[in-house]
Amino acid sequence: MIKRGDVYWVDLNKAFPEGLHYQRNIRPCVIISNEKNNKFCDTLTVVPLTTKRDHLSIHKRIFINNTENFVLPEQIMTVDRKYVLSKLYHLNFILCTFSRKNKS
């Protein structure tokens, strides 16, 4: 069963028509949809990963099988599970970043 925090290979070429501004190719994606959705729905919410470093503060670095990856939260998407291929890894946590500015 697919679980939140799993990293799967997803075929984004088939999931989205060409010409749209989405990540392309078959790439690893973190499953972020909740367990009820993952069990009963035909779609999954995912966030794609890339190995390309671009130094944006919102792109959080994670290591999967000793390979540096970056989470692309601005690319969160819902995909049909038929485009979700094989499991690559499981993260023991979901990445959340909160920032709070002190008001002086």
Q: Which residues does each predicted region cover?
A:
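Conserved functional hotspots at enzyme active or ligand-binding sites that engage polyanionic ligands
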Residues: 1-104
